[in-house]
Curated annotation (Swiss-Prot):
Coiled coil: none annotated. Belongs to the glutamate 5-kinase family. This is Glutamate 5-kinase. It is found in: Cytoplasm. It catalyses: L-glutamate + ATP = L-glutamyl 5-phosphate + ADP. It comes from Haemophilus influenzae (strain PittGG). The gene is proB. PANTHER family: GLUTAMATE 5-KINASE, ISOPENTENYL PHOSPHATE KINASE.
Length: 368
């Protein structure tokens, strides 16, 4: 039975539990839950904060000027400490992890988007848990995703997750500030993110983490518009991750917009104009339109234009009709060499391969 793919985002407050350093006992409990789900067949991806806090503690809380360079220094030192902490804890359960550091450029550039996605799927397919953070040591304002809430939503899209969990130091989203209003009630379900919901989330900001609620609402908006259910839940609740995975009602659930899933994917992948044309034979046309299959090199007759791996191209029939847009796994020069050939010949011809298909069905949109 195929279990769902879940992205779990841990904020610094969840990992430190209010202390100035990573809280190892709490991280151990987190790892125990994820190990249980991993062994039960769930595909888990971790998006982790905490590098700056780990770096500051490792350097014995140095007095540094409040500059971007200082933060990047702490992130550079702390990232290795953070990943080591995760690695040691997962090793107890004989589970391997793989680290990815991402910036916005890795997601917005189509070839890097494909590479990041392929790496994530390769890790998951080999039962390795990806641990992801924004590359704060080198990211500038222009290439930062912005925060790990937003990053986790983009990662959820990358891996086509069913669910995104945003774990925080709050119980979820309340209808007013519970510290100011004793009558404040937890909102268990949000059908749609409206201006009212945004105003609730942005209504207050404190060192307890409520100020970060707006970024979580923005992340939930991005994810749910891509068909990914999102839950804001308390990271310190016992067994919270496992309970969420097995459908217990905890925190605030944001309902996924299933009808928007395809349209958001069109916008995400195919906003740019096409860079070339791949002409296919009748067999490939039938496989794509009637059997919902990927495009194999054997079905390619001609390649027009110069394009890179991951750029958008048109798929055209022998009669001249454009039937699809898609992102090829190979650039135009490589496709010229492998067109009409069997997939088994790819590595012999090119000296490498990105897989047996020229264009995967997941990277293709059929034109009506």
């Amino acid at each position: 039975m195929n279990k769902k793919t879940i992205v779990v985002k841990f904020g610094t407050s969840t990992l430190t539990q209010g202390s100035p350093k990573l809280n190892s006992p709490h991280m151990m409990e987190i790892v125990r839950q994820i190990a249980q789900l991993h062994n039960d067949g769930f595909r888990i991806v971790i998006v982790t904060s905490g590098a700056i806090a780990a770096g500051r503690h490792y350097l014995n809380h140095p007095q540094l000027p409040p500059t971007i360079a200082s933060k990047q220094l702490l992130a550079a030192v702390g990232q290795s400490q953070l990943i080591q902490a995760w690695e040691k804890l997962f090793a107890i359960y004989d589970i391997h992890i793989g680290q990815l550091l991402l910036t916005r450029a890795d997601i917005e550039d189509r070839e890097r988007f494909l590479n990041a996605r392929d790496t994530l799927h390769a890790l998951l397919d080999n039962h390795i848990i990806p641990v992801i953070n924004e590359n704060d040591a080198v990211a500038t304002a222009e290439i930062k995703v912005g925060d790990n809430d937003n990053l986790s939503a983009l990662v959820a899209i990358l891996v086509q997750a069913e669910q995104l969990y945003l774990l925080t130091d709050q119980q979820g989203l309340f209808d007013s500030d519970p510290r100011k209003n004793s009558e404040a009630k937890l909102i268990p379900v949000v059908e749609q993110i409206t201006d009212h919901i945004r105003s609730i989330a942005g209504g207050s900001g404190t060192n307890l983490g409520t100020g970060g609620m707006m970024t979580k609402i923005i992340a939930a908006d991005v994810a749910t518009r891509s068909g990914i259910e999102t839950i804001i839940a308390p990271g310190n609740r016992p067994n919270v991750i496992a309970d969420l995975a097995y459908e217990q009602n905890i925190g605030t659930k944001f309902i996924a917009h299933q009808s928007d899933r395809l349209e958001s994917r069109k916008q995400w992948l195919f906003a740019a104009p096409s860079a070339g044309i791949i002409t296919i034979d009748n067999g490939a046309q039938n496989a794509i339109l009637e059997q919902n299959k990927s495009l194999l090199p054997a079905g390619i007759i001609n390649v027009e234009g110069r394009f890179s791996r991951g750029e958008v191209v048109k798929i055209r029939t022998q009669s001249g009709k454009d039937i699809a847009l898609g992102m090829p796994r190979y650039n135009s020069d490589s496709l010229q060499l492998i067109k009409g050939r069997k997939s088994a010949d790819i590595e012999n011809v090119l000296g490498y391969e990105y897989g047996a298909v020229a264009m995967h069905r997941d990277d293709m949109i059929i034109l009506s």
